[in-house]
């Protein structure tokens, strides 16, 4: 389905990003595993892909750094000659009630989650415009749609990702580039592992399907949006959340 496609996935060393990288590679894409934390985790993702017959490389880069993102994209283009799929998944949380939230906690979350998404799109778009093709998939969150107590920074960043998605779809669509977002709900990752059992149980009670999502649930949606089956879909936010009662 994605043979000969080059895909960059940010924050691909764990969780949703890891699942997306593995899923895209399974469909034939050659993936670039971006990471900024554990090199060992990135190596594990690369090894998993290669053991399954796929192709992958690794690139360490802090996506909140504009110049570093520019260098990363240039290196990818130099290595492969093209970039077909960009998945903006890198994200962090620093939760806290607004009256206790530190300025640096607000800034750091927006710098990674929102500015990081802008940075990679900004530098990837030039190549995709030349190609007159490309798939950009931004990972948002239902927190950016519904809001969530204790997540003023995270919700604001993910709402910003939705606004950025809709605007970029309008700007880039005439050159054959689609831009969509996925808004996951509760997903079993390290981000949700820190939740107490009581909070998890209460959350599951609000989800009509009765469970947290799996990273693969999000990855399957990303594979669809990256494929030619989604060529006529752009400027959409696909909510993957098991239907939360609010």
Model-derived regions, located:
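Conserved glycine-rich cofactor-binding loop
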Residues: 6, 13-15
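The beta1-alpha1 cofactor-binding region of Rossmann-like NAD(H)/NADP(H)-dependent oxidoreductases
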Residues: 39, 60-72, 103, 216-217
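C-terminal substrate-recognition "lid" of short-chain dehydrogenase/reductases
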Residues: 121, 133, 211-240, 245
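Substrate-binding pocket helix/loop in short-chain dehydrogenase/reductase
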Residues: 97-98, 102-110, 192, 203
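Residue(s) in the substrate-gating loop at a strand-loop-helix junction
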Residues: 141
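Short, small/polar-rich loop/turn modules that mediate ligand/substrate recognition or access, typified
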Residues: 173, 178, 233-235
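Active-site helix of classical SDR
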Residues: 121, 157, 165
């Amino acid at each position: 389905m994605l043979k000969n496609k080059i895909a960059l996935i940010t924050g691909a060393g764990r969780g949703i990003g890891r699942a997306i990288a593995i899923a895209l590679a399974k469909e034939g894409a050659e993936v670039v595993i971006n990471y900024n934390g554990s090199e060992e985790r990135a190596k594990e993702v690369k090894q998993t892909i290669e053991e399954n017959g796929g192709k992958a490389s690794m690139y360490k880069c802090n996506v909140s750094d504009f110049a570093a993102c520019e260098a990363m994209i240039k290196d990818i283009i130099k290595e492969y000659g093209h970039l077909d799929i960009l998945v903006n998944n890198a994200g962090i949380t620093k939760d806290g009630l607004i009256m206790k939230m530190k300025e640096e906690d607000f800034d750091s979350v927006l710098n990674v989650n929102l500015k990081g998404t802008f940075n990679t799109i900004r530098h990837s778009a030039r190549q995709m415009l030349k190609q007159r093709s490309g798939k950009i998939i931004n990972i948002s969150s239902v927190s950016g749609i519904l809001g969530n107590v204790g997540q003023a920074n995270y919700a604001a960043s993910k709402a910003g990702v939705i606004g950025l998605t809709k605007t970029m779809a309008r700007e880039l669509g005439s050159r054959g580039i689609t831009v969509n977002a996925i808004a996951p709900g509760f997903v079993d990752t390290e981000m949700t592992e820190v939740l107490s059992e009581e909070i998890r149980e209460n959350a599951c009670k609000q989800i009509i399907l009765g469970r947290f999502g799996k990273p693969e649930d999000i990855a399957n949606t990303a594979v669809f949006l990256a494929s030619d089956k989604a060529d006529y879909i752009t400027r959409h936010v696909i909510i993957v959340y098991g239907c939360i009662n609010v």
